[in-house]
Amino acid sequence: MFKTLAIITKIDNYKEHHLLISLFSCEYGKKSLIVFGGKSKKKNTDFVKGVLTKIEFNKENSCLNSSLIQSYNWFLFDKYRLKVIDYICFLINKLLFLEDKNSEILNYYQRLLIAMNNSSNYLVDLIVLELEVLKSSGYQPDLSDSVIKKVLGGDFSINANSYEELSTLLRKNQNFQEIFSNFMEKVIAKVLNNLNIHLPFNRSEIIQKN
């Protein structure tokens, strides 16, 4: 039996009474698991796209058990925050396949969920998570001082190997957040376009009221 912390990124019906869930964990990468009896009321509430959960599964890729890490007010999320969940799950499902035990994706994703659950400004947390997804998938953008200076229009020097300095810089300035978010929209669009992946909605729709 295997145990791991994972994000459920997609849920499909499997035969008459079961579910097929796609998930990502830093320990095992992308996995598809069968949840036998997953459509029952007892089990169905445990498997929701976007939840961060502890999953137990066997070598036959059958899900044996799951437990939520933290509950969130999903029904209180407005359409923009719900689209953030759809968007991030889409990116992870399309771009991440291999395990990466050094990845901070799950930690950054949890930060994003907490910010949205608290109705806080989540734009910086979203940007940092996007950068980590791109890094883990091998498409990390150049974040050298010259690029940051060109994007934000100032004389800044940050550690390109860590997102903490960038995060601190963006949190101090709402205008910088919007500018860098527009930059990320172009970066994501270019990566997906090169891979012939079509984003089902415009990224700007998820930050319209942030």
Predicted regions mapped to residue ranges:
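Non-catalytic alpha-helical scaffolds and adjoining flexible linkers that form interface surfaces
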Residues: 1-19, 24-210
